[in-house]
A protein has these predicted regions:
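Short beta-strand/loop motif that positions the catalytic acidic residue
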Residues: 286, 292-294
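C-terminal tail/sorting-segment detector
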Residues: 619, 623-649
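Hydrolase active-site cap/lid region
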Residues: 214-263, 319-323, 328-334
Length: 649
């Protein structure tokens, strides 16, 4: 048994089967932002002085995105307000990323709240407007789009074409980066003060909060970020949680539903998009201090920090604001106090509070603080009918009460599971800062009962054959057609290590019908084990159908399939940059041949058509890819086979 487990371990190490969504980097965004663009320019439209401060208004042309043949607003323009207090003390500046409509005249004034930020902080405050440029009309449409409607349109174009310049997040980030470039050049070249602004702290809300994350990930000048009401990192899991809670897509995300974006969730292409737009994909570049501000009643997002906050590294803080919607409503002034306190801490290198928390298996929250708090509170909300805590549907349902220490520095929040419906709760702690400011931070939100009404936690199990030296995985709709490894280590609902029972638990499998295959990995090949796709149904959170599979005789099951259909090893192998492979088709059928990387991520489609019986040959060009192990996978009807290919550059 020890020898068997060691052999399996060696095999798994050799092919490195892993989760489909690893939080590594992707260069698409950075390459787009750094791409030379002669459109970039700026000019000073006017300057005016008031008591204690001066405002410079720049007109910045950041880029050409797409072309006039594709969209009526190809050349992006931004109004940039620079507020310089007379008592300037810092070389860090706060960048407020905001919206605005195309065609607006140069700003003649700045909001009093923005001016106050500059005066209170004694730092430069920069407002970058028109992120994104909107509204726009695309050439294949006759109506205007704004905000999420533009994003949804561009995502659909990317998913259908693979054109990496489509996602709107790319020009949104570049608009901010080039505006920061313009501000620094303006201080250096026009004001002859090259040291006025050397570093930036970014703050943006909603789509601009999204942009805050992504800009911070690719620009080294950013030393801290304050993203507001964008509670959707690890986006696919977060939105599966969203649907699992409601059983429908909230109207707030209706633009994405109308564009069919959620229909891509069972397909591998969605993860290629996530590599570009999901901030968690850039976690290694987000080590700077972070203060995340969320609405506990956001109509766009179900509280979702549990899917990503613990994966973030570096100084990190968050706050859920009770009894608010996406716009923060009447709590906006309090939110500004929290943001300013954090910003002043960054400016002055103040020591921020030290604390930690854990959501325990029973749903309770354990909060431990090293720094003495002003107060610690529990916020609770109950909906006796359904899982819905949206402010615009439920109103101010959150209630708070003080928590007392269970032991020194330890606070426990625990509530009873409701007799009907759902409850939610979180801990909020306030800490002193330099008067009159204070810090307010919170934990993740815990929900009871833990099982969502429209999603299920499912344990998939495969019982192997005695003496089998291979490993098993599953691939299907619930894995977005990505290969997911099963385990025989005694830690994944598989009872004992090495007992031949392979298992994997998937959370938040939302209502719907699913098909999948069981795959054996052995001798560097992947062979489907089931003659017909396995299937199951999730309905109102209940599961019916096949979620476990008993392997009878692996060789007998697949002997006929391999004889009739075949994918031969690639030659040359290793290769650079091209290799050729042959395959055989016995009966007329649809054939697809796809390339996957070592993590199971879809790379490219080589063949995707109906083919007659016969022998075929195809070539794969790996130009543009990094060296590594890739899998060539052929699917025709119920047949699936893979061959490993090594690209060496």
């Amino acid at each position: 048994m020890i020898h068997k487990r060691f052999s399996i371990f060696k095999y798994l190490i050799s092919i490195v089967i892993s989760l489909p969504f690893l939080y590594g980097g992707d260069n698409t965004l950075k390459d787009y932002v750094n791409r030379s663009d002669t459109t970039f320019s700026y000019n000073e439209r006017h300057t005016y002085s008031k008591d204690n401060y001066t405002v410079h208004v720049l007109e910045v042309f950041s880029q050409t995105w797409k072309s006039a043949d594709v969209v009526d607003r190809a050349h992006w323009q931004h109004w940039v307000n620079i507020i310089v207090p007379d008592t300037l003390k810092y070389e860090k500046a706060l960048v407020l990323i905001s919206g605005g409509s195309n065609g607006d005249s140069p700003p003649s004034s700045v909001d009093d709240e923005i001016v106050s930020l500059a005066l209170m902080s004694n730092s430069v405050v920069i407002e970058v407007k028109m992120i994104p440029n909107e509204p726009v009309v695309f050439s294949d449409e006759t109506f205007k789009r704004s905000e999420d409607a533009i994003i949804a349109y561009t995502w659909d174009k990317y998913l259908r074409t693979g054109d990496a310049d489509w996602p709107l997040q790319l020009p949104m980030v570049k608009g901010v980066v080039k505006s920061m470039d313009a501000v620094q050049d303006f201080f250096r070249s026009i004001l002859n003060d090259g040291n006025a602004v050397n570093e930036f702290v970014l703050l943006g809300a909603s789509k601009r909060g999204w942009t805050t994350w992504l800009t911070g990930a690719i620009d080294d000048r950013v030393v801290a970020i304050i993203p507001v009401v964008f509670d959707a990192l690890n986006l696919v899991d977060s939105f599966n949680h969203h649907y699992g809670a409601y059983g429908f897509w909230s109207p707030a995300v209706g633009d994405y539903e109308a564009a069919g974006i959620f229909d891509w969730f069972p397909r591998p292409e969605i993860y290629d998009l996530m590599k570009i737009v999901d901030p968690l994909n850039y976690k290694d570049d987000l080590m700077m201090p972070k203060f995340l501000i969320h609405s506990a009643g956001d109509e766009f997002f179900v509280p979702s920090s549990q899917f990503y906050f613990d994966k973030l590294d570096g100084p990190k803080y968050q706050r859920y604001v009770a009894n608010t919607g996406h716009g923060m409503d009447d709590k906006l002034a309090d939110v500004i106090i929290s943001a300013v306190a954090f910003y002043r801490a960054i400016l002055n290198d103040y020591t921020l509070p030290e604390f930690s928390w854990e959501v325990v298996e029973d749903g309770s929250i354990r909060f431990e603080t090293v720094t003495e708090p002003k107060s610690v509170r529990i916020w609770t909300a109950t909906n006796e009918d359904e899982f819905d805590f949206r402010y615009y549907t439920m109103g101010p349902i959150w209630k708070d009460s003080l928590l007392t220490e269970s032991e020194s520095g330890v606070y426990i929040a625990n509530i009873s599971e409701p007799l009907s419906g759902y409850s939610a709760f979180f801990i909020e702690a306030s800490y002193n800062s330099v008067y009159p400011y204070y810090y307010t931070f919170s934990t993740d939100v815990s929900f009871l009962p833990k099982q969502l009404p429209h999603a299920a936690t499912i344990s998939f199990q495969v019982m192997g054959v005695s003496g089998n030296e291979g490993a098993f995985s599953i691939q299907g709709d619930m894995t977005s057609q990505m290969i997911r490894e099963l385990f025989d280590d005694g830690q994944h609902d598989d009872q004992e290590a090495g007992d031949g029972l392979w298992a994997l638990t998937l959370k938040n499998v939302i209502d719907g019908e699913y098909k999948y295959n069981v795959i054996l990995h052995e001798n560097d090949t992947m062979v489907k084990q089931n003659d017909v796709p396995l299937s199951f149904l999730v309905q109102n959170g209940h599961v019916s159908g096949t979620t476990s599979y008993l392997i009878g005789s692996v060789g007998t099951i697949n002997e006929g399939v391999v004889e009739n259909f075949n994918l031969s090893p690639a030659y040359p192998n290793p290769f650079n940059p091209r290799t050729t492979f042959k395959y055989s088709v016995k009966t007329q059928n649809h054939v697809s041949v796809n390339i996957y990387d070592i993590n199971g991520n879809w790379i490219n489609t080589i063949v995707n058509k109906m083919q007659h019986p016969g022998h075929y040959e195809a070539q794969w060009d790996g130009s543009g890819l990094s060296s590594g192990i890739y899998f060539i996978t052929m699917v025709s009807g119920d047949f699936i086979q893979s061959q490993k290919a090594l690209l060496l550059k």
